[in-house]
Structure formats: C-alpha cells, structure tokens
C-alpha cells in the first residue's frame, strides 16, 4: 500500500544505499581485523628468540622469511587485500629484509654466520620475467588472437560436438579433453588453451547461474589432475620417477607404460569424481546448453596467420621433447608473430591480466627465497621422518607436500621432499613393504603436489582460471580441499594396492 506515495521509490533507494554503506563498513572492519591479525602474528614470529623455533641451524634471515611466509599465507587466505597486492608487497618485503640489497640497519651488529644466506635481489626481481610468466603472456596473447579471428568459436564447436548439448556432458567434455592434453603438454599451456575454447560457451549460459563457475573450475582441476597420468605430465612425476629408478638408489626400473598402467586408471577415476563434485557444488540452471555460438571463423590473411600460428604452437607444445624447444620458449612464438603482423595491437596488450602475472610472480619470489636461504631444506630436515611409523610417514609426507605445494611451486616442493624421503624410505623398505613400499611414499608426494589447488597462487592453471573473473577464492578453496582429501586417499589406496607389480 505504500507504493501510492510518489516518493516511495526514493525512500526505497535511500534504504538500499544505507544497507550498502553499512555492508561496506562491515567489510572494511573485517579487512582491518584480518590485516591486524596477519601483521601481529608476523611481528611476533619476527621478534621471537631463534631457539623458540626448534630448527637446528636456523639463521636470522630464515627467521625473517618464516615471518614473511606466514604473513603471505594469512593475507592470501584472508583476502584482506587483493591477492596480487599481497604478492607485490611480499616481493618488496623480501627485497628489503632478506636480499643482498636489504636495508643496511637490518644487518648491523649481526655476524655473517648468524645472519645466514641472503637471497640475490636479482633472483627475486627475475621472478617477474620467469619462464612461466612468459608462458602466461603467450597464453593470454593466443587467447586474444583466437577470439579476434573467431578461432575459439570454431574449435569450441568441433570439440564439444561429441558431448551433445546436455549441460552435464558439456562439463565432462571439457574435463576429459583438458586432462588428455595435460598428460602430454604443460599444465599451464593446456589451461591457457582450454580457457580460450571455454569463452564462447560461457556466453551461452545465464549470467546468474552457478554452472559458469563449475565450467571455469573444470579447466584448472582437470589440468592439475590430468598431469598425473603420465611421467611427463608434470615435473613432480619425473622427479619421483628419477629417484625410484636411480641405479645407485632404489633402482626399481619403473617404465613409462608401467607408470600409466596404474596412474591412468587412478587419474580417470579422480576426473569423474571431480565431475560429480562440480555438478553438486555448481549445478546448472538449465538441463541443456544451447550452443548457438555466434560468429564464424574469419578468412582474411591475418586470421589465417592466427590459425597457422596456433596450430604450430600446439604441435610444438606437444612435441617439445622431440624438438628440444621448451614449452615456455614456444609460448613466445605467437607473441612475436602476432605483434609483427599486426594481429595484436597496443590496445590488445591492455587486455592482458597483468594483475595475475604479478600475483604469480609473488608466489615464485617466495619459493625462490625459501630455497636460496636454505629455510625450506632446514624445515624438511627438522621433520624426523626416520622415527615415524610407516603409516604416519607415508600419510604425513603426503600431507606436508600437499600443504607446501599450495603456496610454493609444485616442482620445488617435490624437489625438496623426494630426495630426503628416498633416503629415509630406503632405510625403511621392509617396514614400508606392507603398504606398497617406497613407491607409495614417493609417488604419494607427486600425487600430493598435483592435488594442491586451494588458492589462485597454488598453480598457474588456477591463476589463469581466476583471471576469468568467474571464480572466487572461496570456490577454489572448497573444491581444492574436497579434491585433496579424496584424491590423496584414493591415490594411496591405488598405489599401495597395486604394489607396482605389473610386468
């Protein structure tokens, strides 16, 4: 009855404005509280006596790095500020406090032995031009060019045709195709390519539907999981296999086919579980996706350049082991070709998600600091693996790897853990035999690293998917935790059960 008053809508708008201001104020207060907690805990860790940490040989630089690591972790989890802002802040903190170009008063009165190993400031700054960053840029450029030429429309039609128009099967199609590419290509290159194909499909979905989130999440999940299927799918696999087959060590002689014989079925099962989880968490509003994808592939000379360059890039990614050209180097080919031919313009460069690149660079910088200072090695060596019961050793190492890999490079995590666990495992071979042997221990680390995908900075595919704007961090956390728990349990069960006894 109030709508008879002419000023009703003004009153309603005013009330909405008050609610919005109140909500904004509450969010600001929440951010301030989170920021205060992160800073306070970090300062406490910075100021504590070194002996408190219980890590033998811990230096002043390493203590500072622990403080920065905890600060970064809390800021990324709390989202008190945008993730890329935290990354930039972390880089600056590393440069000013633990690098060889840090503030002068932070090194005064401290002996070289107590201070410890500093990080080369160039190593930190090089993270902004890391090869993976170049791969990101190549992926972004490739996506922009594919959209301008209509190639994304053409490929989306061809790839989705076998899966029909039912929403659930379209989602399954993206999962399986992404995983298949990821078994042989770089996870990052695969995600960059598949997200390009996904763009026209997202346009066919309602703006307020959860199905969009599920589709966007499917790409990083499938890219991360798919890489486990082959020894070359992801670096942690290769690292684990190196130590399993080391003639002077375990010497188990596990081949490419033998790895796939037990890891491929596991990977397929996990992919179908991921499909089920995504359907449950992010249900589609409509049963079918009417893929009336508008637009046709263009036939002008610049578009033909895009088609040829795209094909060459994908082929070189697939056969990088044959050609010897690294996938990161391959990513620069489309950048050069498209810039020279005018396919990509100065305005197009503004569409690149530079904030994502900065966010990833911050994670890389933290990983570099952990390794160069020796903190990562000291932390791993401080864990008494040899004294642990076999079950605790296997499960504990997997969980430690999973936790670490969510914040630093999966490859770096595996490179740190696998050598130590290989030594510890070789001295416990009899005790571990009933649980699948040392194979379960080391392959569990590879599995744990691949399943680490809770945050946008956990993996490059996560960061790329987050850049679409379709996924919030809470969505990644939810899916990442569920996939981590189920994947680890199923992974250990699979490897332990098979015992790698296939001929």
Model-based region annotation:
Residues 85, 89-209, 355-356, 360-432:
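Membrane-embedded alpha-helical segments and adjacent helix-loop junctions characteristic
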Residues 2-25, 270-318, 329, 334:
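Long, contiguous bundles of hydrophobic transmembrane helices that form the permeation core
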Residues 23-26, 200-284, 461-494:
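Membrane-core helix-loop-helix motifs of multi-pass transport proteins
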Residues 130-138, 259-272, 442-449:
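Alpha-helical transmembrane segments
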Residues 498-503:
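Conserved small/polar residues in nucleotide/adenosyl-binding loops
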Residues 37-49, 68-76, 90-98, 138-143, ...:
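Hydrophobic core segments of alpha-helical transmembrane domains in multi-pass membrane transport
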Residues 56-59, 71-89, 95-99, 124, ...:
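Flexible hinge motifs at transmembrane-helix junctions and intramembrane kinks/re-entrant loops
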Residues 189-202, 216, 231-246, 335, ...:
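Re-entrant/interfacial helical elements at transmembrane boundaries that shape
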